[in-house]
A protein has these predicted regions:
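Conserved, surface-exposed functional patches that form binding/active-site neighborhoods
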Residues: 230-233
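An N-terminal domain-start capping segment
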Residues: 1-12, 83, 120-131
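Short, conserved non-catalytic motifs in the polymerase core
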Residues: 36-59, 77-81, 100, 134-153
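Non-catalytic, polymerase-adjacent accessory regions of viral genome-replication enzymes
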Residues: 1-37
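Active-site-proximal segment of RNA-dependent polymerases
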Residues: 55-101, 105
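N-terminal low-complexity, intrinsically disordered segments
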Residues: 10-19, 65-66, 70-73, 104, ...
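Conserved polymerase palm-domain catalytic core
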Residues: 91-179, 183-228
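Short amphipathic beta-strand starts and helix->beta connectors
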Residues: 31-33, 84-85, 166-171
Length: 233
């Protein structure tokens, strides 16, 4: 297996033994993850795919060496330094109406090709896009448990955030996203807004989880932010 010096630095590969491990990771990535389930707050179980140290180190190198120049869309509030769930909720305080939507199977829906194209769109070289998309995906999706998955999800979703922000602006609404949770608020939310959002998501191979769609009519204040947080996310 031959990779250039730039990739050696990006991946933190410096020895033949490490290069051999990388070859095995690319050939059979599932063998480098430990899977277990955790209970969801809403019921059911979530599968966590935790990389073994040999893969986790390479993914950590990618995260530290590749993603620092990339910025998430301003409407993204999860996995962004200096932002948190309270900031996400604060955007929507004082909104008379609020619509909360959930993206179904968010991380698993982000395919290797989506990762490749997102990196390419942000100026990464073809070989970087190729190897990163291989190393950071599992079963053609982002593994929940890999340190690179959050940053990649924001990178992939950035063009959609732009579309959804434009849709919100058209109706005079505010929009923000916390991971797979989308929130729209304002004086009046059109009845077909959820359908319009769903149509945009479908263009990018994402789907709404309609069971989690929630609409609220209420005037919020800043002092209610913590209570409101439970509703938004």
């Amino acid at each position: 297996m031959q990779i250039d010096s730039h990739l050696h630095m990006l991946l933190g590969i410096s020895t033949e033994e490490e290069l051999s491990v990388l070859s095995r990771i690319i050939a059979s990535p599932s063998g480098f993850y430990r899977e277990f389930k955790i209970s969801k707050k809403s019921g059911g179980a979530r599968t966590i795919s935790s990389p073994y140290p040999s893969l986790a180190i390479i993914q950590s190198n990618i995260l530290n060496n590749l993603f620092l120049p990339f910025e998430s869309n301003s409407s993204a509030y999860a996995y962004v330094k200096g932002k948190n769930a309270i900031d996400h909720a604060r955007i929507h305080v004082n909104g008379r109406e609020l619509l909360k939507l959930d993206i179904k199977d968010f991380f698993p829906s982000i395919s290797r090709q989506m990762v490749f194209e997102a990196l390419q769109r942000n100026g990464a070289k073809a070989d970087v896009c190729f190897y990163t998309s291989l190393i950071c995906t599992l079963n053609n999706g982002l593994p929940q448990g890999a340190c690179t998955s959050p940053a990649l999800s924001n990178l992939v979703f950035s063009p959609i955030d732009v579309r959804l922000t434009g849709l919100a602006n058209f109706f005079g609404l505010k929009y923000s996203r916390y991971a797979d949770d989308l929130a729209f608020s304002g004086e009046f939310i059109p009845r077909d807004l959820a359908s319009l959002v769903g149509e945009i998501l479908l263009e990018y191979d994402f789907h709404l989880n309609h069971k989690k769609t929630r609409r609220q009519l209420r005037v919020f204040s800043f002092h209610q932010t913590c209570f409101f947080l439970d509703f938004v996310i």
